Amino acid sequence: MTLKELLVGFGTQVRSIWMIGLHAFAKRETRMYPEEPVYLPPRYRGRIVLTRDPDGEERCVACNLCAVACPVGCISLQKAETKDGRWYPEFFRINFSRCIFCGLCEEACPTTAIQLTPDFELGEYKRQDLVYEKEDLLISGPGKYPEYNFYRMAGMAIDGKDKGEAENEAKPIDVKSLLP
């Protein structure tokens, strides 16, 4: 080993210790999570929930568009129908161990039943616990759209009433009439 190699080695050791000393007093970037709140952007996409309409009924009509739009196939559901003709999911299941939180299911939902919340604490010890059923996903409120009701907006027929007899609905137009 030459004197030059010895001085270069000693210089790198001194430089390393100097850098450690500089970084020891620098401001920390690590957040102490439970004590310090985490900043979430306004459009953060977290846990998926199923919402209710203003009347308290489930918004989901089991159209299956969310399952078709999901790129990883983590949503599964089965349609059922009530006595008054309203559709609802008999079961609704999301596997959060596969979900990539892309938000395509929320965009595809015509009833705004599926909504992504800013909740990000989904840690579990067993993978089976990340499969959420309808009871786990359904919340008591309307979520982001408190006044929206799919059955009122879509003009779905109401049992016992003809078209045009429902609340705030105009009578149907007779297209064969010559009257203005």
Swiss-Prot record:
Cofactor: [4Fe-4S] cluster
UniProt keyword terms in alphabetical order: 4Fe-4S, Cell inner membrane, Cell membrane, Iron, Iron-sulfur, Membrane, Metal-binding, NAD, Quinone, Repeat, Translocase, Ubiquinone
A GO CC annotation given for this chain: respiratory chain complex I
InterPro entries: 4Fe4S_Fe-S-bd, 4Fe4S_Fe_S_CS, NADH_quinone_OxRdtase_chainI
Catalytic activity field: a quinone + NADH + 5 H(+)(in) = a quinol + NAD(+) + 4 H(+)(out)
Keyword Translocase: yes
Record's cofactor remark: Binds 2 [4Fe-4S] clusters per subunit.
One Pfam short name: Fer4_7
Topology versus the membrane: Peripheral membrane protein
GO BP field: aerobic respiration
Gene3D superfamilies, per the entry: 3.30.70.3270
Recorded name of the encoding gene: nuoI
Endpoints of the signal sequence: none
Native source organism of the sequence: Salmonella typhimurium (strain LT2 / SGSC1412 / ATCC 700720)
Protein name: NADH-quinone oxidoreductase subunit I
GO molecular function: 4 iron, 4 sulfur cluster binding; iron ion binding; NADH:ubiquinone reductase (non-electrogenic) activity; quinone binding
Binding site for [4Fe-4S] cluster 2: C70, C99, C102, C105
Alphabetized NCBIfam families for the sequence: NuoI, PRK05888.1-1
PROSITE patterns per UniProt: 4FE4S_FER_1, 4FE4S_FER_2
Residue ranges of every copy of the 4Fe-4S ferredoxin-type domain listed in the record: 50-80, 90-119
